[in-house]
From Swiss-Prot:
GO terms for cellular component: fungal-type vacuole membrane. Its main location: cytoplasm. InterPro entries: TLDc_dom. The gene is RTC5. Keywords: Cytoplasm. It is found in: Cytoplasm. May be involved in a process influencing telomere capping. Belongs to the RTC5 family. Pfam families: TLD. One of its GO terms (biological process) is protein-containing complex disassembly. Residues 280-503 form the TLDc domain. This is Restriction of telomere capping protein 5. Disulfide bonds: none annotated.
Amino acid sequence: MGQTASSPQDNKESKSHPQFKTRDEILQYFNTRVVKLFTVTEIAAFKKRFNAIDLNEPIDDTLIKEALYLDAQPNVWSAVSETIRLLQNFPLFHQPIADSITGFGLLKVIAIINVKRFEKLVNTTITRYDITVTLGLCGQAKESENKIKSTNLGDILKTYDHIEIESIHIPYDKLILLVAWLLTLVTGVATTNCKVELSDTIANWNNFKSSAISIANTISTSALGNANDIGIPATDILNAFNTIMISLVPYMSNLFEHLLFGVDDLIDHVNDLANLSHQDVLTPSLYAQVIIGLPNSITITKLQKLYVGKESGFSMRSLQSKVFRWKAPTLMIVSGTRISDDESYADSKNPRYRSFLYSFPKLRENDQNLDAIHLTKKKVTYAVYIDEPWKVSNKEKFGATNMTIMELTPQQKTYQSCMERTMYFNTIGGGIGVGSEQPIVKQNDIKFIPGNISLTMDSSLEFGVFRHVGAGGGFKTSLLDNDDSKSFEIRFIIQNVEVWGCGGEKELAEQLKQLEWEEAEAKRRQTINLQSLSEDKALLEMVGLVGQHQSGGSV
C-alpha cells in the first residue's frame, strides 16, 4: 500500500504485453498467471485453509476474516473486504465488484501487496501498484463499467483501467479505519509465518485510531471539519503513502502471506517489543508512528527503557545517569501541552515561564503561522532519533547524519538532519537542544539560539519549543510540507520525557550485560563501604572514642 506505478515507455510496453480480444481474457490471463507465483506447497496450504478446491469458487468470508484476525473488528473488516473485492478484479477496476471473494481473487491480493510477487505478476517495468488509489474506486466502477471497453493491457496498467484519480475522494472514516489497522500490524505481525496475537492492540484500538488521525491530519487539511462530507483526495493520500508511510507495506504483506500457511504451520515468535506499554508515552501505536517516520535505512528491532521523567525525576542529572551509559542509538520521546497564551500563563499560572520567555527569542506575531490543526489541538508529542551515544556537550555538539526529529501529535511530520553535530546536552544551564546552536550562558543569564527547524528544552525539563522557519539549518523540511518556508513555533509545558535504547539483539545483549555489571559493581562497592565503616567504628570503640554514649571527638 503506497507505491505508485512508474511511467514506462509506451512502445516497449506494448510489445511486452500479450494481446487480448476481450476483457474477460485479461482476467483469465492474470488468474492463470497468479497461481504460478506460488509454490505447490503454498497453493495446497491455501486451498486446505480456505476449503478452496476450485479457486474460481467464492471463499467463506468468515474464514478470511479469521485468517486476517478481523473477526472481532466488523467495521475494519468491512473496509478491508471491500478493498479485497475490488483488487480481485485486477487490473480491471471498472469491472462490477462481486459480493464474494474467490480463491483467485485472494491470491491476486497477496501478490499485489508483495513487491517481488507483483513484479513477476505484471512482468513489466511498472514496479509497483498503488493500492490506496483503489480505496475510492468502488463508487465509480459500476457507473463506468459499460463505458470502458479497452483491452490494451499496457494502457490499463498505467491508468488504473482509465480511472481519473484526480476526481477520487476517499471517505475520512474509511481511511482512519484502514490506517489504524495497518498501524496495529507493525507490532503484531513481525514475519510471514509467525503466530499473531492482536488481542492487546484490539483492546487499545482507540490509541491506534488516534495515531491514524494524526496521520490523516497531515495528509490533508480537509481532515479537519467536513472531511466526512467531501472525503480526502486520493492524490493527497497517494503522496503521503509514497513519502511517510511506505514502511507500512511490508507489515501488510507479512499478514497476507500468512494465508499461505496452515494454522498448525505458524510458528511461535518472541515479541521483541513486549516491553512497550500503553501506560508509557511511547505506546505501541506511537512506536508504529516512529517506524514510519524513520528513514528506510534505520531499523529498530528492540527497545530498552532507559529513562522516564515521571519515574526518575525531571532533571538533567537524572537523565544523564540513566542514559549516558548506553553506547548505541536512542529514541527520545517528549510530550506536553501547547501554551496558547504566553502572557496569561506566565502571569497567572507559572512565573518561571516568564524567565524562559526572556531567555528564548520568540517569533514575531507576523511570523507565527500555526495551521488550523495546531490551533485547535493542545497535546503535542515529539520524537528524536539520536544516532550517537549521548555526551556532555557544553561547547561542541554531537550527532551524525541519521538524526531525525518527528512530530507524532497532532500531526505526523519527519525532519531529517542534513549535517553532523546537531544536538547538545548542556549541563551549565543550557538544557537540551536538537537543531539549535549552543545557548549563551553567562552567570545566571541564558540566551537560547534556536535553529530553523529545532526542538529545545530548558535545563529543568519544564518547557519546550519546536520551531520551524523553513530550510537552511541542520534539518530538512518535512516531505509533506506544501509550503516549506512557512514559519511557526509551538511552545509547550513538558509533561513527560522518555529515552529508549535502540539496537538489534547483539547491541542490546552487550549493553544489558554492561549495565548489569555496573549495577552489580555499584552494589559490591556499597557492601565494601558498609563493611569498612563497620570496621572503623569497631576500632574507634576499642580506643574509647565512640560508643558508651560518646559521640566522638578529636585526639
